C-alpha cells in the first residue's frame, strides 16, 4: 500500500493512502457477494438473486458507498500498522466522501486523504534555570486568636436580655416580612415579596451578615418592638428577580439574647479538641498554621514555576486528548457541586453542554500541558517517588475510605502520579531562582492576562 505522511498542527499526521486496483475490486466483489447471500429481494429466495437484479434493486451507489466506507477504515488501519504510527481517537477523513464515491471504480486505484491524532509532543525549554517571583505567606498569630474567637462564639451560652436595646454581637429572634419598595411618588399599595417572610428567625448581629443594612437596622431595637428597614438587595443576589431591588423589611424583635463566651481554659480545650490543656491546643494550632503558611508559600512557588514552564515548553496537543480532558473537568466540577449540596440537574442539561464544554476548554488545555511537561521532565531526569512514600500515602487514604469500595490498583496509580508531580516540582524548586515577595503583592495570572490584552 502506498502511503504518504505529512505532519500537521495540533499533533496530527496527515495520510494520503492509495488503494490498489486489486484491493478495490476485491472489496467491491466481497460486498456484492455478501449482499447476494443476505439481501431480501421480493420474488427471489435468499442467496438466489441474480447479480444484475441485485444491483438494480439495491443500487450501485449504495453498494459503492458501503464498500468504500469499510475499505477506507480497513486501509487506514493497515496504513497505521505499516507506517508504525501510534494513533489515538478516531480518524478524520479529509477527502469528501461523496466525491470519493463518484470516483470509486472497482478494479481501479483510488487515493484518499485522512488525518489521525497522535500522542502529543513536548519541546522542553531550559527548565533547570527557572527564575520566578512568588508570594511568601507568613504565619500570623492573629489567625490563632481568630480561631479561638470563632470557637468561643460557637460554644457561647445565650442569655435572654430584657433591660437594654440590641447591640452588635447579640442574637435576635425576629419575625419579618419583605415588600417591594414603591417607586418615588408612587402611592399604590406595596407588594409582598414572594418567599421573603419568616417567623422565629435567628439573626446574629454581626457585620456582613444578611443583606447590608439589615443587621444595622435591628441594632437599637428592643424586644416586642417593630420597625421597617429599607435595604437594597446586592446586584449578585442569587434570586435574579430581587438582584439590585430596593425592599422594605417589616421586622419584629421577639427575643433578644446576649452571648456569654466560655473562658479559654483547659475545660474549653477538652470541649473543642482532643487536647487536655489549652496550652497543648495552642501549641498544636500554632504548628498547624505555621505549616499551612509554609505550604501556601510552596504552592505559590510551584504555581509560578508551572506558569514559566508553560511559556518555555511548547506542547502540541491533539484534539482527542483535549476533549477527553474537558469531559474530566466537567465531571469533577459536577462532583464538587454535588458534594456542596448544589442541584446540578438544571445546569447540566443538554442545551447547556456545548457552552459548558467551551468554557472548560482553556482549563483542560492548561491542565494537560502542565501534566505532559512535568511527565516529560520526570522521564528525562528519571525522577520517581520513593516507594515508602507511596505506601504511606496509600495507607493513609485507605484509613479514610475503610468502609467504601475502592479500586486499589487505580488508587496506587493515582497516588504514584500525584507524588511524582510533587517530586518533580520539588526538584525544580531546588534548581530555580526564587524571589519571595509579601503575600498579596502579585496579581493573579488572569488579571495580568486581561491587562496585557487591553494594552
UniProtKB/Swiss-Prot annotation:
It is found in: Cytoplasm. It catalyses: [protein]-peptidylproline (omega=180) = [protein]-peptidylproline (omega=0). Keywords: Cell cycle, Cell division, Chaperone, Cytoplasm, Isomerase, Rotamase. InterPro entries: PPIase_dom_sf, PPIase_FKBP_dom, Trig_fac, Trigger_fac_C, Trigger_fac_C_sf, Trigger_fac_ribosome-bd_bac, Trigger_fac_ribosome-bd_sf, Trigger_fact/SurA_dom_sf. The keyword Cytoplasm applies. Its EC number is 5.2.1.8. One of its GO terms (cellular component) is cytoplasm. It comes from the Bacteria. GO terms for biological process: 'de novo' cotranslational protein folding; cell division; chaperone-mediated protein folding; protein transport; protein unfolding. Involved in protein export. Acts as a chaperone by maintaining the newly synthesized protein in an open conformation. Functions as a peptidyl-prolyl cis-trans isomerase. Belongs to the FKBP-type PPIase family. Tig subfamily. NCBIfam families: tig (TIGR00115). This is Trigger factor. The gene is tig.
Amino acid at each position: 500500500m502506498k502511503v504518504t505522511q505529512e505532519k500537521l498542527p495540533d499533533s496530527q499526521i496527515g495520510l494520503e493512502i492509495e488503494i490498489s486496483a486489486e484491493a478495490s475490486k476485491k472489496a467491491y466483489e466481497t460486498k456484492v457477494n455478501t449482499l447476494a447471500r443476505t439481501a431480501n429481494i421480493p420474488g427471489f429466495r435468499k442467496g438466489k438473486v441474480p447479480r444484475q437484479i441485485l444491483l438494480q434493486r439495491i443500487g450501485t451507489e449504495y453498494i459503492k458507498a458501503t464498500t468504500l466506507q469499510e475499505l477506507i477504515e480497513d486501509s487506514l488501519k493497515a496504513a497505521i500498522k505499516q507506517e508504525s504510527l501510534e494513533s489515538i481517537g478516531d480518524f478524520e477523513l479529509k477527502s469528501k466522501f461523496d466525491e470519493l464515491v463518484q470516483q470509486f471504480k472497482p478494479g481501479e486505484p483510488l487515493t484518499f486523504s485522512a488525518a489521525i491524532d497522535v500522542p502529543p509532543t513536548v519541546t522542553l525549554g531550559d527548565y533547570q534555570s527557572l527564575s520566578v517571583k512568588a508570594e511568601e505567606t507568613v504565619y500570623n498569630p492573629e489567625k490563632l486568636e481568630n480561631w479561638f474567637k470563632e470557637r468561643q462564639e460557637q460554644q457561647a451560652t445565650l442569655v435572654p436580655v430584657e433591660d437594654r436595646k440590641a447591640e452588635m454581637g447579640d442574637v435576635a429572634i425576629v419575625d419579618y416580612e419583605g415588600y417591594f419598595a414603591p417607586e418615588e411618588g408612587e402611592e399604590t399599595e406595596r407588594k409582598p415579596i414572594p418567599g421573603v417572610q419568616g417567623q422565629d428567625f435567628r439573626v446574629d448581629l454581626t457585620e456582613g451578615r444578611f443583606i447590608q443594612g439589615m443587621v444595622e437596622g435591628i441594632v437599637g431595637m428592643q424586644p416586642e418592638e417593630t420597625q421597617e428597614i429599607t435595604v437594597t438587595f446586592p446586584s449578585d443576589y442569587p434570586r435574579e428577580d430581587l438582584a439590585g431591588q430596593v425592599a422594605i423589611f417589616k421586622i419584629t424583635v421577639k427575643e433578644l439574647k446576649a452571648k456569654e463566651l466560655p473562658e479559654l481554659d483547659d475545660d474549653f480545650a477538652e470541649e473543642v479538641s482532643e487536647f487536655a490543656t489549652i496550652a497543648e491546643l495552642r501549641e498544636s494550632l500554632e504548628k498547624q498554621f505555621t505549616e499551612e503558611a509554609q505550604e501556601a508559600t510552596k504552592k505559590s512557588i510551584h504555581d509560578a514555576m508551572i506558569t514559566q514552564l508553560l511559556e518555555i515548553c511548547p506542547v502540541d496537543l491533539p484534539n482527542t486528548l483535549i476533549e477527553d480532558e474537558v469531559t474530566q473537568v466537567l465531571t469533577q466540577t459536577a462532583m464538587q457541586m454535588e458534594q456542596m449540596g448544589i442541584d446540578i440537574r438544571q445546569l447540566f442539561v443538554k442545551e447547556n453542554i456545548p457552552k459548558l464544554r467551551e468554557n472548560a476548554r482553556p482549563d483542560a488545555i492548561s491542565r494537560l500541558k502542565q501534566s505532559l511537561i512535568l511527565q516529560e521532565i520526570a522521564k528525562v531526569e528519571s525522577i520517581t517517588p520513593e516507594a515508602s512514600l507511596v505506601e504511606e500515602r496509600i495507607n493513609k487514604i485507605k484509613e479514610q475510605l475503610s468502609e467504601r469500595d475502592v479500586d486499589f490498583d487505580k488508587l496506587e496509580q493515582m497516588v504514584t502520579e500525584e507524588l511524582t508531580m510533587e517530586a518533580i516540582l520539588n526538584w525544580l524548586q531546588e534548581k530555580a531562582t526564587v524571589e519571595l515577595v509579601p503575600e498579596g503583592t502579585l496579581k493573579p495570572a488572569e488579571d495580568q492576562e486581561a491587562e496585557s490584552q487591553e494594552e
